[in-house]
From Swiss-Prot:
GO terms for cellular component: membrane. GO terms for molecular function: lipid-A-disaccharide synthase activity; phospholipid binding. The lineage of its organism: Bacteria, Pseudomonadati, Pseudomonadota, Betaproteobacteria, Burkholderiales. Keywords: Glycosyltransferase, Lipid A biosynthesis, Lipid biosynthesis, Lipid metabolism, Transferase. This is Lipid-A-disaccharide synthase. It catalyses: a lipid X + a UDP-2-N,3-O-bis[(3R)-3-hydroxyacyl]-alpha-D-glucosamine = a lipid A disaccharide + UDP + H(+). GO terms for biological process: lipid A biosynthetic process. SUPFAM superfamilies: UDP-Glycosyltransferase/glycogen phosphorylase. It is an enzyme of class 2 (transferase). It comes from the Bacteria. Its EC number is 2.4.1.182. PANTHER family: LIPID-A-DISACCHARIDE SYNTHASE, LIPID-A-DISACCHARIDE SYNTHASE, MITOCHONDRIAL-RELATED.
Length: 389
């Protein structure tokens, strides 16, 4: 029982990105319910701060993606943060360390902490089923337990001797089963009859650098075919300058409604989204929206990634449905024309092939149901078992 563990539970967490900050915030809700006097320290963002995290560094310090020069440029700073964090945690001796995603940073840290007797939990299984299967050995050495957000993962990890629990995907509870498109449009000043394309070029600066201009060039081509279409772009403050720069470079700034955050409102309001591969694609699927998934990265990162990829899909909706239910355009294939053509197919399907859109929505509804669990409670219970073990 929770009361057998000190009510003054000391938890350390690291979340390295916006998506991890959201997941960790929900996890803290579950922990706080069991241990109201809990204290939490580490690395995180605003969602974690709202739940009482004392942030030693902001999560933006770890928000870097790729394998090549994108990582090498920040390597020294990130290694320095990890070294300082390890020293502080070994001095403080928290009851449990929870690494939220960010496996490149967290697994090494977890391995060091576990070796010194600190309980370690990893929230969001590294995608050994998609690529980098060699990582399974490091996971086994580094963590006491993995909290999985996809239902097939615990059995896969168990085959490698790793304890794991399926806790559902928190977003499946945050996003309503039947999103209110009209309310979302009203909130954004859009009419029910408008045709709306949401453009989400990523949550990292490197993604904005590689995708935003290309996405807005595609929007220009779509605008030529359908001048009445509304384009909505949610932008978090840290990325807004880069997004606005790309908008000006594309000549589309007058046609793009760039708004502060509100990505969920934007996805609820849209008819179709042009979207960077990542967690946002799962959000779009849970909103039951047709999408075109794209990704571009540095040449070296791409060469490494394509050699390690184990599945034919990159986008989470396609991976989870085990089929190309929505198009993916990657690297050199993600031209402005190809992106525009793929979006226009969805726009035209609304009138010409409504059954195609209905079938997609049915698949996404089934996926939503499968992922919907009481994640904060299940995760807190699993952590409780680790603490008692």
């Amino acid at each position: 029982m929770a009361n057998q563990i000190s009510q003054h539970l000391q938890v350390a967490l690291v979340a390295g990105e916006t998506s991890g900050d959201l997941l960790a915030g929900l996890l803290l809700d579950g922990l706080r319910e069991q241990w109201p006097l809990m204290t939490a320290v580490g690395i995180g963002g605003p969602q974690m701060a709202r739940r009482g995290l004392v942030a030693w560094w902001g999560h933006d310090k770890l928000s870097v993606h790729g394998f090549g020069w994108e990582v090498l440029r920040r390597y020294r700073e990130i290694v320095g943060i990890r070294r300082q964090l390890k020293t502080r945690l070994l001095r403080q001796q928290p009851d449990v360390f929870i690494g939220v995603d960010a496996p490149d940073f967290n697994l090494d840290l977890e391995q060091d902490l576990k070796a010194q007797g600190i309980k370690t939990v990893h929230f969001v299984s590294p995608s050994i089923w998609a690529w980098r299967p060699e990582r399974v050995e490091k996971i086994r050495r580094s963590v006491d337990h993995v909290l999985c957000i996809f239902p097939f993962e615990p059995a896969l990890l168990a085959r490698h001797g790793i304890a794991a629990t399926y806790v559902g995907h928190p977003l499946a509870n945050v996003i309503p089963m039947e999103p209110d498109r009209s309310a979302a449009r009203a909130a954004l000043g859009l009419a029910d009859g408008d045709q709306v394309v949401a453009i989400l070029p990523g949550s990292r600066q490197s993604e904005i650098n590689h995708l935003a201009l290309r996405f807005f060039q595609a929007a220009a081509l779509i605008n030529k075919a359908h001048p009445a279409i509304k384009f909505i772009v949610p932008a978090i403050p840290a990325l807004r300058a880069g997004i606005e720069h790309a908008a000006r470079a594309s000549g589309m700034q007058a046609h793009l409604q760039i708004i502060a955050g509100q990505s969920h409102t934007v996805l609820a309001a849209c008819d179709v989204t042009l979207i960077a591969s990542g967690t946002a694609t799962l959000e779009a699927a849970l909103f039951k929206r047709p999408m075109v998934i794209a990704y571009r990265m540095g040449w070296l990162s791409w060469q490494i990634m394509r050699r390690k990829q184990l599945q034919p899909w990159v986008g989470l909706p396609n991976i989870l449905c085990q089929d190309f239910v929505v198009p993916e355009l990657l690297q050199d294939a993600a031209t402005a024309q190809a992106l525009a053509d793929a979006v226009l197919l969805w726009i035209d399907a609304k009138a010409s092939h409504p059954a195609k859109i209905a079938a997609l929505q049915q698949k996404f509804t089934a996926l939503h149901t499968e992922l919907q669990r009481d994640t904060p409670r299940l995760a807190a219970h699993a952590i409780q078992q680790v603490l008692q073990g």
